[in-house]
Every structure is written in C-alpha cells, then in structure tokens.
Amino acid sequence: MTDRPCTPTLDRVTLPVDIKGLTDRELRSLADELRAETISAVSVTGGHLGAGLGVVELTVALHAIFDAPRDKIIWDVGHQCYPHKILTGRRDRIRTLRQGGGLSGFTKRSESPYDCFGAGHSSTSISAAVGFAAAREMGGDTGDAVAVIGDGSMSAGMAFEALNHGGHLKNRVIVILNDNEMSIAPPVGALSSYLSRLYAGAPFQDFKAAAKGALGLLPEPFQEGARRAKEMLKSVTVGGTLFEELGFSYVGPIDGHDLDQLLPVLRTVKQRAHAPVLIHVITKKGRGYAPAEAARDRGHATNKFNVLTGAQVKPVSNAPSYTKVFAQSLIKEAEVDERICAVTAAMPDGTGLNLFGERFPKRTFDVGIAEQHAVTFSAALAAGGMRPFCAIYSTFLQRGYDQIVHDVAIQRLPVRFAIDRAGLVGADGATHAGSFDVAFLSNLPGIVVMAAADEAELVHMVATAAAHDEGPIAFRYPRGDGVGVEMPVKGVPLQIGRGRVVSEGTRIALLSFGTRLAEVQVAAEALAARGISPTVADARFAKPLDRDLILQLAAHHEALITIEEGAIGGFGSHVAQLLAEAGVFDRGFRYRSMVLPDTFIDHNSAEVMYATAGLNAADIERKALETLGVEVLARRA
C-alpha cells in the first residue's frame, strides 16, 4: 500500500459541473490524477480495476462535454464506472467500494442521480439509451442518451437488437463502442486519427462527404493506407458499414486515450447530431498501470493489492475453490469419456473451464456473452450424441431460461448445467446473487436439480451428471473455497433423488439443501448442548425429491425445518407441497422453511449477507427452538 496520490486538479472537482471550466491542458492533468486515484482506491478495496483504467480519458471527456445528470450516461456492465463515481460526488466514499454500507461496484440508481440506469449484467446499455431517447421524444426527461458499451458486450444479441430498434426509431441517441481488443496498424491508425479530426471539424451531416473528400487531401503515402482502412472496415464485423446499415452514423475508430481526439469528436456530436450515432473508440484495458496491463485479464478483477508492485493480498485457504473442484472433476470425467465437452458464455476463467480448455481445447466452446445461444448450442450438442456441460453463473443462467424450457427440457435433452456462484456472492451484491435457479429450474418436468453440500459432494455430482442421459440435469455450488473435507479420489454417481442422513437425532429434523449444511451442523451442536439432539440430513436433490427420506423424517419427528440458499419457491416449497399432498399437516405436524428473504440484499461479505438473510447457525438454532415452542430459550439464542 502507498499514501494517497497528489491530485491538485482532481481536488478542485466535486461534481461534473466543476469540470466545465477546465482547459484542455487541465483536463489532461485531471485524467492522469483520476487514474492515480482509481488505482489507489481499488488497492484498498479490491474490485474491477482494468476496465475503469481503460476509460479514464473517455470518462473525463464525457463529463466535460455532456451535462449529466440531465444527459444520461449509461455504463454497460458497470465494471468501468469507478472513475465516473469519483467525478460525480462520491470521491469521499470511493474507498468504501464493494464494502458493507459503501458504494456499489456497479452503477446504481438509488446511489446517485448520476447513475441514471443500474448495471451489473452486460449488453443492456444500448437498449436503455434507446428507451431514454424515446421517452425524451414523448415528453419525458430531456437530455441526451449516451451508452458506453465494450466490444465484449457487443457479442450479445441484445446489443444488436437495440441497435436495430434504435436505427429504426431514428431518434438522437449516442453509442460509444469502447473497443479494448482491436489494434489498428500504424498507417491505418494515423489515417483514422486524421479522418476523425476532419469529421470533428465539419458539419455533422457532411461527415460522409468529408471522409470521401479527405482521401485526395492526404499525403500520398497515406492514400494506400486509407484504401486499406476502408476495405478493413468493410470486412470486419465492427466496421462502420454494419452500423450504418443498422441506421447509425459511424465515427471512428479514434484513440480513446487521446483527449485531443475525444474532445472535438464528442463536441461535434453533441452540437450537430440529429439521429443515431456510434463512436468507435480504441482503448487499452488497465491503461497506465503496468501490473494491470500485463495481467492475463488486464486486471479485470483484483483483491486488495500493493500499488508499487501490484502484488495482491490473497487470503490463505486450506481447501480448494468449488470452481476448481468442478473443473478438475470434469477433466477426470472427460479423460475417460470423449463425448464430454464444455460450454461457457465468456467466463472461462470464472467457471474454471480455462483449465478444461487447456486439457481439451477442441472440446471447449466459449460462445461469448450469449447465454441463450450457449444453452441451445448445448442442447444440439446433446442431440448430436455429445455429453455437454454448460457452465454458467446462476445469475447469468437467468438470461437463457426460455432456451432451458423450450430447447432442453421439452425435448428432454441431457444437457448438464454446472451452476457456479449459487447463493449470495458477496461484494458484487444483488445483481450477481444466485438466488433464483432452484426455483426456476425445479418446476420443469423431467429435470434433475442437485446442490453440493461441500466440495466432496460436488465431485460426486459431476460424476452423476456425466452418467445421466435421461434428460437435463443441473448442479449448483457457491463462490469461494470448500470447507476442507476429505476429497474422494474419484467421483461416484449418486442415486438420483436420494438424500442422506448425516446424523441421527430426535424431536426435530434439519434438512439442508446445499452448502448451508456446515451451518446446520453448528446449529445442531448448539441445540445438543441445550439437550435437544436434532437429526441432520442432506437432501442433495430438489428435483426429484427424496420422498421416502422426507416422509420418514416427518413420521419420526415433531418438526422439520428445511434450509437452503435460494429464494421462496425453491426446495422448501416443493417439500411443503409433498407434505401437504401426503396429509402430513393433517396431524398437526410442524414444518418451517428457511430461505433467502423476499428482498434484494445489498453487497457485503458473504458471511454478513447470510447473517442479514437469517441463514447462519444462530438463526437455524433459533428457528428450531421457536418451532419446538421453546420460546424462552429461543429469545436467548
């Protein structure tokens, strides 16, 4: 860690209005200081560093030219919003990023009027901008609508759906394509810079004419470069021709780190555009901080780190992460079954499929930010005789739900869904919480839904999924490390729809689904100290339920409590349905279901979030005492 940077220009800026009086030279100083402040802040909190560093100059230019919050600046995904937050009245809290009670790591409407539209998932910004522009034309909020979207987010179909609609409506809307992957060769780059300056100096309606006429004005060595640039833009998917066919005037590419290019182009668009415009800027993720630029993911997400060295502060763990256990287990299964393949939607590292891809590159598919396509692609792989594992975060699987129903479940195709980040995920907060998958999957006919209680169970569930060819099967597991149990040498397929009793007891049964089992066992020990010895069981399956186990627990106990890391409508609701149909409640049987509360829980550590949700050991103990009518002890618990 180091002391905070010296930021004399940034110290003069509290809100975007303070930027308006700065000279272009001062804006360049502001950008340098903003980059240093962003690095310093994230070194304290951890977070998504690289994306923000890549848009520092763009952020300064946008707030210098546009009039937020009247003008709506919409940041796609939100990973890149830290510099924006510093310039919009939140610098004094920037070192609370992603901390409990602190700033969100994404844009959030309830946090600031400058966050006009919340984010967390990708590829939504253009739709929002088109919507804001339509509202303006119908008499709603005035001001421009500006979407800032990365080239990665452009791999999602939703972005092009929005471009198509925006071009059709023909309302003034500005899309800035933040391209941090392409590189333009020097001759072409020089040409692009020159043409961009010509564009900025001409009336907007004459942009195309200026571009055509510019060729003859260029120095002779540049003319061939100009022709090559024109052909290149026609041949690649991000070229201007595609966007113009969709109804957007195309400007660029320009250097997104050069304020001498950004400022005049944005000024011209602000002053003269009357219809949809797309500005293509080239940036570098992690710009200005060598450790981030050198990182494989260019500093996408980091823990706390030392500013001087870039060395991250990582907690020591005695157990492997669930993600790594999944990846290693899948590799073992694939070594003996050539039909096993893996599909991810732009998250190979996050899902562990980068490890699988290193071992089996021809059996690994990264489809981009396209969960809908990932699911249907996996369905066809299964129909074609393969055994696909579709590994997607719980929160992102929501984006492919229709395909799960229509293309997988109805056709009973054996797609294996590996659902990472199940339950509450900590610092990323509500947008990334895996709260709903059990509820929206378990109501589908013919699907198998499992949840691993620990890392050893996950190994067996990977083996179970690999061996299951009778229809779709899903297994969920959380973010973070396992609990440190002894690991099996090899996964053994579980009997479908069969749970297990962990420990025998009397009076009350605690039936866990997922990794709350560790907390359930702590609660059971506390209850035993009070003279109440509960039975503890691991359901393993939410669909199909272990009817025999559940009905036996009901028959031999006064009460049953289910515990899960999911929303209302999931495992506990299915257990209640079973008990009701079996007439168990007719004899006065006591049943309680502990689930995530019916609210979106703000970011914090996962431990604090589960305490807020009422799903830690003390809460389980208290619920057991209340259910048994031990009110005095329950109040003390």
From Swiss-Prot:
The record's EC number reads 2.2.1.7
Name the chemical reaction catalysed here: D-glyceraldehyde 3-phosphate + pyruvate + H(+) = 1-deoxy-D-xylulose 5-phosphate + CO2
A Pfam family it matches: Transketolase_C
Domain of life, source organism: Bacteria
Instruction: Name the cofactor(s).
Output: Mg(2+); thiamine diphosphate
Q: Name one GO biological process term.
A: glyceraldehyde-3-phosphate metabolic process
Question: GO MF terms on file?
Answer: 1-deoxy-D-xylulose-5-phosphate synthase activity; magnesium ion binding; thiamine pyrophosphate binding
Provide the residue positions that the database annotates as binding thiamine diphosphate: 79, 120-122, 152-153, 180, 289, 371
Q: Where does Mg(2+) bind?
A: 151, 180
Q: Which UniProt keywords apply?
A: Isoprene biosynthesis, Magnesium, Metal-binding, Thiamine biosynthesis, Thiamine pyrophosphate, Transferase
Q: In which pathway does it act?
A: Metabolic intermediate biosynthesis; 1-deoxy-D-xylulose 5-phosphate biosynthesis; 1-deoxy-D-xylulose 5-phosphate from D-glyceraldehyde 3-phosphate and pyruvate: step 1/1
Provide the cofactor note recorded for this chain's UniProt entry: Binds 1 Mg(2+) ion per subunit.
What HAMAP family does this protein's entry cite?
DXP_synth
What NCBIfam families does the database record attribute to this sequence?
dxs (TIGR00204), PRK05444.2-2 (NF003933)
Q: Which family does it belong to?
A: Belongs to the transketolase family. DXPS subfamily.
The job of this chain, per UniProt, is described as: Catalyzes the acyloin condensation reaction between C atoms 2 and 3 of pyruvate and glyceraldehyde 3-phosphate to yield 1-deoxy-D-xylulose-5-phosphate (DXP).
Relate the assembly described in the record. Answer: Homodimer.
Protein name, entry field? 1-deoxy-D-xylulose-5-phosphate synthase 2
Taxonomic placement: Bacteria, Pseudomonadati, Pseudomonadota, Alphaproteobacteria, Rhodobacterales
